[in-house]
Amino acid sequence: MLLLLARCFLVILASSLLVCPGLACGPGRGFGKRRHPKKLTPLAYKQFIPNVAEKTLGASGRYEGKITRNSERFKELTPNYNPDIIFKDEENTGADRLMTQRCKDKLNALAISVMNQWPGVKLRVTEGWDEDGHHSEESLHYEGRAVDITTSDRDRSKYGMLARLAVEAGFDWVYYESKAHIHCSVKAENSVAAKSGGCFPGSATVHLEQGGTKLVKDLRPGDRVLAADDQGRLLYSDFLTFLDRDEGAKKVFYVIETLEPRERLLLTAAHLLFVAPHNDSGPTPGPSALFASRVRPGQRVYVVAERGGDRRLLPAAVHSVTLREEEAGAYAPLTAHGTILINRVLASCYAVIEEHSWAHRAFAPFRLAHALLAALAPARTDGGGGGSIPAAQSATEARGAEPTAGIHWYSQLLYHIGTWLLDSETMHPLGMAVKSS
């Protein structure tokens, strides 16, 4: 009953915290500050975004094999009958309407953008899934992951902006390939699962208050780990729970490396990392938190430096940013302060939205309920070993064992509320972990 009441209390408080920022629209700085419409710049002829090859991890990913009508993977394709999209279908087989679900979702979003940008004009698809071998070897058209598009009026002066709208709609790679069309493609469904969520690999380490280090995957409620307050001062913070925990996950991580000192941090695209302002030489992180996917060489992250027995945070220049696929699991630890030192690099505990302070306030009800339960629930004794289990652990983990696998219910609640209240541009497209199909 106590846990049920706590959940109801959390839901009410979380909703109120998120609704208030969404409704506030007055002047000044704060959660309710209006976002100015983004100025859209047309793509130049032969430009592609992102600026990497199409079939790399940073774009739509590798080719996975041709899909035919007789293959087992044909069921991965779904027809698109959106009346706001014109399909050329010159083969007269309906093949151009077939595509993966991800491609369909992005195409439907783009169709709305096109009608908003040019009233009376629709999106036109000239090529979708190809079963006849008309494209180059290993083309993503053979998997239903690519489309070639124009506007219905075939006004070529619009194509640069059409490409930009495709980028904004969420296509994973957009190329102003020809003066006659724009080429767009998406990741494979299993690749999306590998890139989604906001986590660290299980092999990452944290520093414990009692000394030494511990693997992230081995953290338990009651552990106190090295973190930082909002002024950049190092301290030890209570580990509360995992916001996401997947032991068997195979994920694509961004590898952020510094040289002086030499440190390396792995985290998923949607996780937040603190970056120092250009004019800052001190240890205070301030409000600058970026998605890992936006961190670039030359920017500075915060690392632990030890000088004469004094340990403090200092900015260190990022030397390289690469991608690596690992099968070490995926873990998103939450501390009471909302920050954590992973592999000696300061990171946020949050992901999905690029506002650390928003996220930390949204978790205030969870922290409060955790503290109340820890105070109300007495530490219980583990009959097997004779030792006592901390109250915080017995309150939050029903079995007194390792934290529950999967995405934490409170994270899912906030995510769903956020999708109702926040602009889609506020949320990272790979923010919430998805299961591979």
From Swiss-Prot:
The record marks 271 as: Essential for auto-cleavage. Residues 1-24 form the signal peptide. One of its GO terms (cellular component) is Golgi apparatus. InterPro entries: Hedgehog, Hedgehog_Hint, Hedgehog_sig/DD-Pept_Zn-bd_sf, Hedgehog_Signaling, Hedgehog_signalling_dom, Hint_dom_C, Hint_dom_N, Hint_dom_sf. The record marks 198-199 as: Cleavage. Gene3D superfamilies: 3.30.1380.10, Hedgehog/Intein (Hint) domain. It is an enzyme of class 3 (hydrolase). A lipid is attached at residue 198 (Cholesterol glycine ester). The keyword DNA-binding does not apply. It comes from the Eukaryota. Zn(2+) binds at residues 141, 148, 183. Induction: By retinoic acid. The record marks 244 as: Involved in cholesterol transfer. Ca(2+) 2 binds at residues 91, 127, 130, 132. Disulfide bonds: none annotated. Expressed in a number of embryonic tissues including the notochord, ventral neural tube, floor plate, lung bud, zone of polarizing activity and posterior distal mesenchyme of limbs. In the adult, expressed in lung and neural retina. One of its GO terms (biological process) is thyroid gland development. Keywords: Autocatalytic cleavage, Calcium, Cell membrane, Developmental protein, Endoplasmic reticulum, Glycoprotein, Golgi apparatus, Hydrolase, Lipoprotein, Membrane, Metal-binding, Palmitate, Protease, Signal, Transferase, Zinc. A lipid is attached at residue 25 (N-palmitoyl cysteine). Ca(2+) 1 binds at residues 90-91, 96, 126-127. Its EC number is 3.1.-.-. Glycans are attached at residue 279. Belongs to the hedgehog family. Interacts with HHATL/GUP1 which negatively regulates HHAT-mediated palmitoylation of the SHH N-terminus. Interacts with BOC and CDON. Interacts with HHIP. Interacts with DISP1 via its cholesterol anchor. Interacts with SCUBE2. Interacts with glypican GPC3. This is Sonic hedgehog protein. It comes from Mus musculus.
